[in-house]
């Protein structure tokens, strides 16, 4: 048996309906689209969300919220990703050099996820309580 010889069991698959192939099929001539009208035409139909000219629900409801500009330049760094950084001192530039965060990031916060084995010194980064405990348990320290 080879992959190119595999086929479904006989009778387990239905052939697709072939529309517009003669009156005897029951789907000839208009091919199940009825007579005239927008939906019978090629490319016919309305876009999703169109309500026939009535003011759509999306526009009837008010706008809400905003996108924080600071969130676009802030990153969360997991504790286990600190292992990718060469050297003992970890700051924003060290994270960028190790490709842990992208170049446009201006703020980073270290969060507890995974473990760290070696002692490191974290400088100028925000650190959660859990991440702080994990770093200090490994013999590292945090400098503000």
Curated annotation (Swiss-Prot):
Sample GO molecular function, one term: structural constituent of ribosome
Which GO terms fall under biological process for this protein?
A: translation
- Quaternary structure (record): Part of the 50S ribosomal subunit.
Q: Where is the composition biased (Gly residues)?
A: 21-31, 42-52
Any one GO CC term of the record: cytosolic large ribosomal subunit
Return any one Pfam family short name: Ribosomal_L27A
Q: Where are the membrane-spanning stretches?
A: none
UniProt xrefs under SUPFAM superfamilies: Ribosomal proteins L15p and L18e
InterPro entries named among the record's database cross-references: Ribosomal_uL15 (IPR030878), Ribosomal_uL15/eL18 (IPR021131), Ribosomal_uL15/eL18_sf (IPR036227), Ribosomal_uL15_bac-type (IPR005749), Ribosomal_uL15_CS (IPR001196)
- The protein here is known as Large ribosomal subunit protein uL15
